[in-house]
Amino acid sequence: IIALDATISSRPKGQKLDEFFHEIKEKYPDQLLMADCSTIEEALHADELGFDFIGTTMVGYTEQSKDLKIDENDFEILRTILSKVKHPVIAEGNINTPAKLKRVLELGAFCAVVGSAITRPQLITKSFANAIK
């Protein structure tokens, strides 16, 4: 699976997501592609384009989603995406506790990516230290 930035952010040479996606699928029709999205609208667009997987990777990390957190209101953004897309949804971005992992799977995510919680142990250590200050 290759993940692509599916946000509305600008791309090199001003290329649009639709064009980039179709170029890849034309050249590599069997390649599985995941859309890294930051908003519901981006997820819906990626789903319509035909991405094999829709990811919540960029929620909270872009200008258009800076006020969002994936776990707000019992994962409201994830629940909305799950209810509106036909392709499998991969929960990614700030899935940093076993409880969050369990919840996104209960909600129907195809799978989840636990990134920084594993690859950057200093962040988890800091969260534990801050909790007891």
Residue ranges and their predicted role:
Residues K25-A35, L82-E92:
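Short beta-strand/loop segments at the ligand-binding rim of alpha/beta enzyme cores
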Residues I1-I8, Q31:
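Short intrinsically disordered, low-complexity coil segments enriched in acidic
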Residues A6, C37, M58-V59, G93-N94, ...:
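Short secondary-structure boundary segments
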Residues S38-G50, V85-K86, A91, I95-A112:
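Catalytic cores of alpha/beta
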Residues A6-K27, I40-H45, T62-L82, P98-K102, ...:
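Active-site-adjacent beta->alpha loops and helix N-cap segments on the catalytic face
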Residues I2, A46-T57:
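Conserved long hydrophobic alpha-helices within structured protein cores
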Residues I2-A3, M34, G55, V113:
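Conserved beta-strand positions in the central sheet of alpha/beta enzyme cores
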